[in-house]
């Protein structure tokens, strides 16, 4: 069954003639993995029918199935796996009717996929590349020496076909397993973010960094050995030029070059795709934090204030004295008649008077919205108020107005996660971003 000689119609006819089919529900797949695990602990690699029944009993217990029909269901499962060429059955007259079972290459391949090859190992990849480099070095030297057809087949074609090509296939399989692992990590991250993104940030960071590190290790190892491997393949290819009888070797070298280029190229592309996904997740987290800081945090703060007597809390703040620059050269540039700060008493009385006046005005103006359940557009109301005061007082007036408005109610749009539009509140470029308050 050489990959160079079989065509698609021939493979279809071969599969139809041999009645190939694989049906592995979750229970049967677990049974097959249990057989592979127990078989790996044995030196002879053989299992009796009783041992298979015991393994099926463990699987049946794990799936919480009845124990009354274990023997019958185990026998059916064993026969089904023999029919699907996952197990080979050997019988002998010396064994008194007791059969011996061994895993087939198909069964080993399936269990290897689910058990043994799920973990990436940089050491394993380095050893594989080291073996490939040695095989290619010897094959290149043999190709440059030249010889008869037997020499080329034994010392060049055979190592390339049965050693180098198989290791390349193994590396390609490792990459494909990494592709599946990436999809699994993405599903885990999505599940974590959907449950509670605050608690999931650390777990997401760990999953992202681990996958990024594994991809980078894989690619660095491949790139470090890739140039040397390609150089030896080119040496073999140059040795076949002009020899019409070495077309099979030349085609094999070309296929290996293409496979190596594809492996290295896909490794870099996988890293680039993962970097894009990493940025997407971080952007989502930053957006969620900004939304929480600007929207949900305000709601939690209001609830904390309202429930203070049930759940008391303490607020600590720092208020350092301002540093005033009293140098002569600075004073000469100032045009104000008086420098420095106002006396604390005078400043407190002025600010307090404005606050009381605004509080009364806002309470009277907003009473209509609360009674009639009308939506309150904070941007429009704030613009009307600021037009009545000088520019120097706009910040204080806006702050008081916001404090009074949030005591009235909240905007249902705050919980949608969508940002509000920026609205101009004066003629000097000041803007406010707030949803319309519609829940009192």
Swiss-Prot record:
GO terms for molecular function: calcium ion binding. It is found in: Cytoplasm, Nucleoid. GO terms for cellular component: cytoplasm; nucleoid. InterPro entries: Chromosome_partition_MukF (IPR005582), MukF_C (IPR033441), MukF_C_sf (IPR038198), MukF_M (IPR033440), MukF_M_sp (IPR036141), MukF_WHTH (IPR033439), WH-like_DNA-bd_sf (IPR036388), WH_DNA-bd_sf (IPR036390). GO terms for biological process: cell division; chromosome condensation; chromosome segregation; DNA replication. CDD domains: MukF_C, MukF_N. Its main location: cytoplasm. It holds the Pfam family MukF_C. Residues 208-236 are annotated as: Leucine-zipper. Involved in chromosome condensation, segregation and cell cycle progression. May participate in facilitating chromosome segregation by condensation DNA from both sides of a centrally located replisome during cell division. Not required for mini-F plasmid partitioning. Probably acts via its interaction with MukB and MukE. Overexpression results in anucleate cells. It has a calcium binding activity. Interacts, and probably forms a ternary complex, with MukE and MukB via its C-terminal region. The complex formation is stimulated by calcium or magnesium. It is required for an interaction between MukE and MukB. NCBIfam families: PRK05260.1. This is Chromosome partition protein MukF. It comes from Yersinia enterocolitica serotype O:8 / biotype 1B (strain NCTC 13174 / 8081).
């Amino acid at each position: 069954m050489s990959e160079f000689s079989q065509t698609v119609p021939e493979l279809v006819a071969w599969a139809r003639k041999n009645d190939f089919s694989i049906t592995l529900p979750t229970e049967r797949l677990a049974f097959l993995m249990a057989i592979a695990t127990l078989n790996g602990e044995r030196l002879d690699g053989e299992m009796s029918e009783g041992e298979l029944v015991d393994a099926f009993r463990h699987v049946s217990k794990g799936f919480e199935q009845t124990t009354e029909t274990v023997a019958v269901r185990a026998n059916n499962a064993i026969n089904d796996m023999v029919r699907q060429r996952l197990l080979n059955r050997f019988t002998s007259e010396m064994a008194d009717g007791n059969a011996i079972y061994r895993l087939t290459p198909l069964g080993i391949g399936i269990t290897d996929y689910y058990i043994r090859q799920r973990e990436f190992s940089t050491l394993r990849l380095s050893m594989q590349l080291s073996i490939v480099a040695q095989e290619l070095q010897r094959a290149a030297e043999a190709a440059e020496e030249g010889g008869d057809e037997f020499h080329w087949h034994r010392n060049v074609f055979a190592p390339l076909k049965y050693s180098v090509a198989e290791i390349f296939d193994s590396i390609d399989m490792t990459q494909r397993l990494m592709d599946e692992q990436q999809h699994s990590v993405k599903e885990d991250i999505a599940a974590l973010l959907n449950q509670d993104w605050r608690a999931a940030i650390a777990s997401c960071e760990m999953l992202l960094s681990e996958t990024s590190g594994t991809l980078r290790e894989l690619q660095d190892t491949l790139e470090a050995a890739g140039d040397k491997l390609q150089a030896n393949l080119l040496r073999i290819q140059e040795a076949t030029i002009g020899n019409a009888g070495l077309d099979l070797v030349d085609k094999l070298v070309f296929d290996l070059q293409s496979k190596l280029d594809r492996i290295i190229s896909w490794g870099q592309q996988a890293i680039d795709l993962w970097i894009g996904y990493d940025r997407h997740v971080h952007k989502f987290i930053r957006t969620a934090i900004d939304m929480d800081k600007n929207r949900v945090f305000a709601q939690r703060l209001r609830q904390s204030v309202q429930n203070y007597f049930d759940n008391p809390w303490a607020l600590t703040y720092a208020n350092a004295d301002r540093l005033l620059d009293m140098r002569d050269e600075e004073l000469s540039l100032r045009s104000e008649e008086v420098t420095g700060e106002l006396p604390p008493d005078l400043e407190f009385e002025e600010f307090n008077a404005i606050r009381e006046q605004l509080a009364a005005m806002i309470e009277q103006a907003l009473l209509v919205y609360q009674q009639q359940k009308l939506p309150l557009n904070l941007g429009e109301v704030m613009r009307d108020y600021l037009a009545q005061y000088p520019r120097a007082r706009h910040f204080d007036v806006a702050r008081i107005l916001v404090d009074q408005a949030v005591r009235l109610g909240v905007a249902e749009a705050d919980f949608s996660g969508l940002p509000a539009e920026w609205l101009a509140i004066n003629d000097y470029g000041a803007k406010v971003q707030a949803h319309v308050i519609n829940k009192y």
